[in-house]
Regions:
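Terminal ABC-like ATPase head and other globular end-domains that cap long coiled-coil arms
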Residues: 1-153
Length: 153
């Protein structure tokens, strides 16, 4: 419903503000077409730097990853608040980090480390080599001959 979408955006924007250093705010598109908005959550983004509202589709790969992460974490928080004690303590991220520059990678990892310190289990599936030094416990999957070998580091 509309109330849930608004609440999720409030939570998502707290995270988006952190990840974008205050540059971006996610906004619901105006209900100009009435009826379209009930099919899903159509978003724009307010760019604090330019002062303009633009389509979320214009975000770069790294910015899109930050928006997606913000929305996922915002949805998780909203479900926990509204579902009477249900806790979502696990998050898996499959790739996505490859589009981030080093500063954005730092911001994303800091956000995920905060979740880790809140006793959340964060699983990251990635080929980004910069992550190897940042992640304490790793499962490394390598192809050897005709099979995959898993190693705990």
């Amino acid at each position: 419903s509309d109330v849930y979408k608004r609440q999720m955006l409030i939570y998502a924007n707290v995270i988006m503000k952190q990840l974008s250093q205050g540059r971006y705010q996610l906004l619901r598109k105006d209900d100009a077409g009435k009826g379209r908005s009930q099919q899903g959550l159509e978003l724009d983004v307010f760019d604090q730097e330019s002062g303009n509202i633009r389509s979320i589709k214009t975000l770069s790969g790294g910015e899109s990853f930050k928006a997606a992460l913000s929305l996922a974490l915002g949805l998780s928080r909203m479900v926990q608040d509204y579902a009477g004690g249900i806790e979502l303590n696990t998050l898996f991220i499959d790739e996505g980090f490859g589009s981030l520059d080093s500063q954005s990678l730092d911001q994303a990892m800091n956000c995920l480390m905060e979740l880790h310190h809140e006793n959340k289990l964060i699983g990251i599936i990635s080929h980004v080599s910069d992550l190897k030094d940042r992640i304490e416990r790793q499962l490394v999957v390598e192809r050897k001959q005709k099979q995959s070998v898993i190693q705990m580091i």
